[in-house]
Amino acid sequence: MMKSMHDTHNTQQPAIPGYLIFMLALTAGMAVASLYYCQPLLALLGNDFHLNSATVGTLPTLTQAGYALGLMLLIPLGDKFDRRHVILVKGLALATALAFTAVSPGLALVLVASFIVGITATMAQDVIPAAAAMTDSSQRGRVVGQVMTGLLTGILLSRVISGFIGEWFGWRSVYLAAAAAMLLVTILLWRALPRFTPASTLSVGELYRSMFSLLATHAKLQKAAVAQGLLNAAFSAFWTTLALMLYQNFHLGSSAAGLFGLAGAVGALTAPFFGKAADRFGPQRMTRIGALLTGVSFLLMLFAGSAINTTWYLPILAVLTVSFDMGVQMCLISHQTIIYNTAPHAMSRANAILLAGVFIGMTSGSLVASQLFSHWGWQAVIAFATLVSALALLLRLLPERRTMISDTVI
């Protein structure tokens, strides 16, 4: 019989085994990767179902919308119920939704399945607090950082994997392989995960209501959610339309779009250093540096657009992909540091609010970018990304408002 996890504030935790850290990082990466498999496959899906770029662009939009909904409705339940049960149920549901996507005969069913994929992929955000709960406070930052590296790597390598598999075996093979892998890792977690004692005694209704109170009384949380949402709108706009641009301008397949995921993976691999930098120089300063790096990267992409049909454009684009992704990830980790310090007794709910802002931004970015690309092309998408990045920087430069602290929301 597995033992329950005790309150880490009151009890010294044994060291979490290295294999379990690796498994949790792998799970977080695989779950969140499910959101992005479709992006390098859009041209293949469009050809298969005979759809234009604007219509097929609704696929990542619905997936991100499902994720945002799941963040708001399901992530807070990790404070109320045993996280082991929550993770395992979501793992089975995600594997089922991925398999259903693979066998769907038409776009309508693919869209429904993708929406469910988005909802259940939120298990990635259940894994992170689970890792924290199993770790003593003196080691928690290191362990959570390792799991976050797995999550961020999953986001970017998902495009590489789906791009190559889609190019050689078709888009349905991507989802079949993902479903099988998700089922396998869920079985392994069933064997390895301990039980967790729920952290909150609030009812489900009170738990949800407390999130509104948390957001209303913490100005820093509001600012973090909006600023990161703007940055991720730029992030999503770029990745949603990249495969379409490469196909139309360079006649390159999904594997080429996937290769850009390797360039972006550099940002994920540097994530642990951003947390240390936020501790050393302050998270506020790091959000400003990250937003500036993101905005400048997109501005340079805009200027480079005049050379879009030359051999120099793709290498320049690859370098700027690395830099803008580093900026977005730098801001995300720094914003997490800010909200955890702002609401230390409600980290799961604060994290849910921040990430809901992130993926509302990503949903909006996908939708806007699909329409911009369809009507005005790639340069319009990059102009949009530059604009929203500049707005995020402006927001981070504004002076901080005094936060109204309220412990009654806990």
Regions picked out by a protein language model, each given a short descriptive name:
Residues 69-107:
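Conserved MFS/SLC helix-loop-helix module at the cytosolic interface between two early adjacent transmembrane helices
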